[in-house]
A protein has these predicted regions:
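Active-site beta->alpha loop and helix N-cap motifs at the rims of alpha/beta catalytic domains
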Residues: 1-82, 86-88
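Glycine-rich phosphate-binding active-site loops on the catalytic face of alpha/beta enzymes
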Residues: 15-22, 124-157
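Flexible loop/turn segments at secondary-structure boundaries
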Residues: 26-28, 60-61, 90-93, 128-131, ...
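Alpha-helix-loop-beta-strand connector modules within alpha/beta enzyme cores
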Residues: 35-51, 102-120
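Glycine/Thr-rich beta-alpha phosphate-binding loop at enzyme active sites
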Residues: 67-108, 135, 149-164
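Acidic carboxylate-rich catalytic motifs and surrounding loops in phosphoryl-/glycosyl-chemistry enzymes
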Residues: 85-90, 122-128
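C-terminal structured domains
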Residues: 142, 147-221
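C-terminal extensions of enzymes
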Residues: 193-287
């Protein structure tokens, strides 16, 4: 109780909505899961309008029926807003890792359930969270820095060598739901400028600063497109399914025309695996 009260006091001090604290969960049956649920209930007792949060690793989200039962007990709190997060153990080059289809489908089922009564935000989601938007989330977390677009535990560590580093440059390809290296984007531009503009979603960002705003605009457009299908989950899934189909076809063309520049692993990470997550979720819900 005292911990939740301190958190709420600090949030009130900066005029932020009350967001209940939580723990990173590995299993719905672990002691931490019971503690997290107790904190959620305490927070609701203090402020019935408090937002709630749910953070889990892949093992948590992949726990099937046990996950669904746990989420059902949380949905009963009827929080106005739920913020959910896929916690990664390791992040490589900030490329989405949706290899564990079961885990991401579990997150989507959770969003589906919570969205029946609450608004749902997927934190640290970016383009990898589009299947969760189809499942009912209306907002995804992102940022101007690539490290803000996925939950990387190392991002919260103190850097023992804060020397000057020159990061690689990237360009968001909105039509591909992807972020590719700038030299790849330039190769696509040289191959076919009109095709490049279409899949990029606009002119080539001349600088990394412009690219940051371009990225957020492309992501916002994708989320709005899915939200535009309305609350019906089947319609939202159909909207994203069509988007992934177009991206896959464009990737096939690029891989054929620009071999060794646009590669199969790019398509797999940004199009194929997210599409598999969408279909796994849709199948589980009869969509």
């Amino acid at each position: 109780l005292a911990h939740v009260e301190r958190v709420f006091d600090r949030q009130s001090g900066i005029h932020a909505p009350h967001l209940a604290p939580t723990l990173q969960l590995h299993s719905p049956h672990a002691p931490d899961a019971h503690v997290a649920r107790s904190m959620a209930r305490i927070a609701r007792g203090i402020d019935a309008n408090s937002w709630q949060s749910l953070v889990g690793t892949r093992s948590f989200w992949a726990s099937g029926a046990d996950l669904d039962a746990y989420v059902g007990s949380l949905a009963a709190l009827r929080a106005p807003v739920w913020m959910v997060t896929m916690a990664n153990e390791l992040v490589t080059d900030q490329v989405p890792d949706l290899e564990n289809t079961e885990a991401y489908a579990g997150l989507c089922r959770t969003v589906h359930s919570l969205s029946m009564r609450s608004r749902v935000i997927v934190e640290y989601g970016d383009f990898a969270a589009l299947p969760a938007v189809a499942a009912g989330a209306d907002t995804v977390g992102s940022g101007w820095d690539r490290g803000q677009r996925t939950f990387d535990p190392m991002a919260f560590q103190v850097d023992s060598d804060p020397g000057i580093r020159i990061p690689a440059s990237y360009v968001t390809q909105g039509g591909l739901n992807s972020v590719l290296r700038r030299d790849t984007a330039e190769a696509i531009e040289r191959w076919d400028s009109s095709h490049a503009r279409r899949i990029r979603g606009g002119p080539m960002p001349p600088s990394d600063q412009v690219q940051r705003m371009h990225h957020l605009a492309q992501l916002r457009g994708a989320v709005r497109q899915i939200n535009g299908a309305g609350p019906d989950k089947a319609s939202r899934v159909a909207q994203l399914r069509a988007r992934y189909s177009t991206a896959a076809a464009d990737y096939d063309t690029l891989i054929a025309r620009l071999p060794r520049i646009v590669r199969d692993p790019d398509k797999s990470a940004w199009a194929t695996k997210p599409s598999k997550v969408l279909e796994a979720y849709a199948s589980s819900e009869g969509l």
